[in-house]
Swiss-Prot record:
Keyword Metal-binding: yes
The protein's required cofactors: Mg(2+)
Alphabetized UniProt keyword annotations: Cholesterol biosynthesis, Cholesterol metabolism, Endoplasmic reticulum, Isoprene biosynthesis, Lipid biosynthesis, Lipid metabolism, Magnesium, Membrane, Metal-binding, Multifunctional enzyme, NAD, NADP, Steroid biosynthesis, Steroid metabolism, Sterol biosynthesis, Sterol metabolism, Transferase, Transmembrane, Transmembrane helix
Function as written in the Swiss-Prot or TrEMBL entry: Catalyzes the condensation of 2 farnesyl pyrophosphate (FPP) moieties to form squalene. Proceeds in two distinct steps. In the first half-reaction, two molecules of FPP react to form the stable presqualene diphosphate intermediate (PSQPP), with concomitant release of a proton and a molecule of inorganic diphosphate. In the second half-reaction, PSQPP undergoes heterolysis, isomerization, and reduction with NADPH or NADH to form squalene. It is the first committed enzyme of the sterol biosynthesis pathway.
Homology family: Belongs to the phytoene/squalene synthase family.
Protein name as it appears in the record: Squalene synthase
Family annotation (InterPro entries): Isoprenoid_synthase_dom_sf, Squ/phyt_synthse, Squal_synth-like, Squalene/phytoene_synthase_CS, Trans_IPPS_euk-type, Trans_IPPS_HH
Molecular function (Gene Ontology), one example: metal ion binding
Length: 417
């Protein structure tokens, strides 16, 4: 199936080959775990089990930053698992969320009653908290602070809906913006980045909001089936009486109009994303931050004006994901990627769309940030004849490609709420 999808995109097929035959290690080097303690090895095992996509880029981080971000992720994954567990009553869940940050200093605390798929991070929380306490104090301080704020924020939204767009921003701040702020404080604490990265919380928050809003938009149908609602009522109530009505065929035109309005809202974070990424100096941190952002940008472009959001799953091609991972390793390339997908959206804006003018305006604003009007070198350097020849040779060994690393599948399919 991936071979068929790549026929119209020969550069993606070529990049699939390069990725499998060594290109992956240039972007995501393999981590040596031989020198790790048994408890830290267990933490990395949980990291790979709960999110292979984030595990790949986390394990590619330099120095002690790698362990700090690994533990940060697992702590927040445990907190998120508590929040998501619908079998726990709100009366019991609220104090758990409020006090969760304190459990990091209780060596024996664990929670064994969760029914969620990632419950192992709660059941074996003593292993995670042990490695947390082994971190330098400068990292512990950041993780505890973010964990406390996130726990209180999650508790606030347990029994209330996202009403306004302002509330949407607030919810996304609690569950994702705080992650961006926390990471941005960890980076300079490691001395791998300048203090400004951690001081500019507005742009760090935008990094998280952009990813979270993209996931919420894409996952409309899945969330509806699970009884969850994250689209802001202020927006969708202009089109239908109930959010679930968008899934009805007779409402598809209204559904797409609302979709386009939310995507336009989300595009407003891209200028902050560009500014944030342009300040990064460490290569491993740049890759860690840039890859999820360009994946989200490609996903938004795939969702824009697309009825499929309300009918099934919208995801980018595996070859497209691999190409983005291999290209997004420097700022000029990231700018070119953003330019490409902004143009895709711009040329698909319906004249009849109520939000068309606003969409055009934000894309024009993004264009002013020195986005190059050109293709990426890796996508235009090779001639069509050369690419076709490569495809012919590659087709003979397609079975080999079927074992392509699961990391690319996760980047395409995994939405982390």
């Amino acid at each position: 199936m991936e071979f068929v999808k790549c026929l119209g995109h020969p550069e993606e097929f070529y990049n699939l080959l390069r990725f499998q035959m060594g290109g992956r290690r240039k972007v995501i080097p393999k981590m040596d775990q031989d020198s790790l303690s048994s408890s830290l090895k267990t933490c990395y095992k949980y990291l790979n089990q709960t999110s292979r996509s984030f595990a790949a880029v986390i394990q590619a981080l330099d120095g002690e930053m790698r362990h700090a971000v690994c533990i940060f992720y697992l702590v927040l994954r445990a907190l998120d698992t508590l929040e998501d567990d619908m079998t726990i009553s709100i009366e019991r869940k609220v104090p758990l969320l409020h006090n969760f940050h304190s459990y990091l200093y209780e060596p024996d605390w664990r929670f064994t009653e969760s029914k969620e798929k990632d419950r192992q991070v709660l059941e074996d929380f003593p292993t995670i908290s042990l490695e947390f306490r082994n971190l330098a104090e400068k990292y512990q301080t950041v993780i505890v602070d973010v964990c406390q704020k996130m726990g209180f924020g999650m508790a606030e939204f347990l029994d209330k809906r996202v009403t306004s767009e302002r509330e949407w921003d607030k919810y996304c701040h609690y569950v994702a913006g705080l992650v961006g702020i926390g990471l941005s404080r960890l980076f300079p604490a490691s001395e791998l980045e300048d203090p400004l990265i951690g001081e500019d919380t507005e742009r760090a928050n935008s990094m998280g909001l952009f990813l979270q809003k993209t996931n919420i938009i894409r996952d409309y149908l899945e969330d509806q089936r699970e009884g969850r609602e994250f689209w802001p009522q202020e927006t969708w109530s202009k089109y239908v009486k109930k959010l679930g009505d968008f899934a009805k065929p007779e409402n598809i035109d209204l559904a797409v109009q609302c979709l386009n309005e939310l995507i336009t809202n989300t595009l407003h974070h891209i200028p902050d994303v560009i500014t944030y990424l342009s300040r990064l100096r460490n290569q491993s941190i740049f890759n860690f931050c840039a890859i999820p952002q360009v994946m989200a940008i490609a996903t938004l472009a795939a969702c824009y004006n697309n009825q499929q959001v309300f009918k099934g799953v919208v995801k980018i091609r595996k070859g497209q994901a691999v190409t983005l991972m291999m290209d997004a390793t420097n700022m000029p390339a990231v700018k070119a990627i953003i330019h490409q997908y902004m143009e895709e959206i711009y040329h698909r804006i319906p004249n009849s769309d109520p939000c068309s003018t606003k969409t055009q305006q934000i894309i024009s604003t993004i264009r002013t940030q020195n986005l190059p009007n050109c293709q990426l070198v890796s996508r235009s350097h090779y001639s069509p004849i050369y690419l076709s020849f490569v495809m012919l040779l590659a087709a003979l060994s397609w079975q080999y490609l079927s074992t392509l690393s699961q990391v690319t599948e996760d980047y395409v399919q995994t939405g982390e709420h």
